[in-house]
Amino acid sequence: MASAPRVSEVLTKKNLPPLSLYNFYIYIRDEENAIEFLDLFLDIMLHKFLFREHIRGLYKAGVTSTSLNTESSSTLGPHHFTRFRSASLSLEDLSTVYWPNFGPLLLEELSNEQTINSSDLLLSKDRAAYLKNLLTSNIQSLTQESTVISKEQVKMFTQIIIEKYFNPASPHEVMLPPQLVQPILDCKEHQRQDELRLFEDVETYLLNFLLKPAYYRFLNHKFKHNLNPLTCTGRFIIGYVSTFAAYWLGFCGIFLDYSRRKRVWTLLPFAFGFYNLICTWSKHDPVLALLGYSEVKPFHYEKVLQPSIRLSLNRRAIFVLSIIVLIVGANTAIFSCVPSIRL
């Protein structure tokens, strides 16, 4: 795994599949059952990004450093923003511009049904699928002079994050150490939701103690496996039934005195059965790997574009195929070559 990308590269969508943010999101959701933590981390990234864009907009508009310091300490009055009113983005525009870069940005609260693709997302609740279909090249540029983020918009985003993840009454509440949560709640009470470093300690905790360990498990999974666990369950059932049928046909061929030419056809159910059973055991489909594909969700495949991942999967595919051929060949030879006897 020496050539594997860092977790920061995956979280900022700078890497190729299967080590992509979309796949990492699916893994955290299905395997780690910690999707709320990843959602929170992505939304904190968005909070920092919006704050910096807000500061950049103030600089472009000619705000002095003194005014900027006053703004960051939450003492800047609303009259300073009247000059930017014609250039400010609406909240609906913000959801379409900033959401795609960072993934799950509380879309249920921030977007309306007229926003592109948002209505489908609200119905399906599949935020991971929305991540996959987005292309960074199609996102509106944030460097336009006409786009300015206001203080009120930053505070509104912050308020939504606090209410969703730190409110005990919220269904999406994340369980974090009290020493991390209490300062955030105190800022809410004192109306200081526009501070850049408000979520800094939470971000560090999530990255170092939750996301990095999960990412190493994600890497191990992608380097060794290319099947979804739900598919493995189905493959096990199919393989078990097929293998049972192969043994049943093999014994019938022996005790009903069938010729060896006929009994050799037990090769087919043995091959089909053991292929699925061993794929389930290894969570690896060798044919799929040699074709260069990996299963993300049940019956949903994507091309493996990461060279190191593809090389690792191909090596494992040869090993798994060797085991399958050995077991199938041994069973076929036994049931074909054993002398038959009519009972």
UniProtKB/Swiss-Prot annotation:
The keyword Glycoprotein does not apply. The chain crosses the membrane at residues 236-256, 264-284, 318-338. Keywords: Cell cycle, Cell division, Cell membrane, Endoplasmic reticulum, Membrane, Transmembrane, Transmembrane helix. It is found in: Cell membrane; Endoplasmic reticulum membrane. The keyword rRNA processing does not apply. GO terms for biological process: cell division; protein localization. Pfam families: RGS. Its main location: membrane. It comes from Schizosaccharomyces pombe (strain 972 / ATCC 24843) (Fission yeast). Residues 257-263, 339-343 are extracellular. Residues 109-228 form the RGS domain. Disulfide bonds: none annotated. InterPro entries: Cell_Polariz_PKAAnc (IPR052246), RGS (IPR016137), RGS_sf (IPR036305), RGS_subdomain_2 (IPR044926). This is Protein rax1. It is a multi-pass membrane protein. One of its GO terms (cellular component) is endoplasmic reticulum membrane. May be involved in cell polarization and division. Residues 1-235, 285-317 are cytoplasmic. It comes from the Eukaryota.
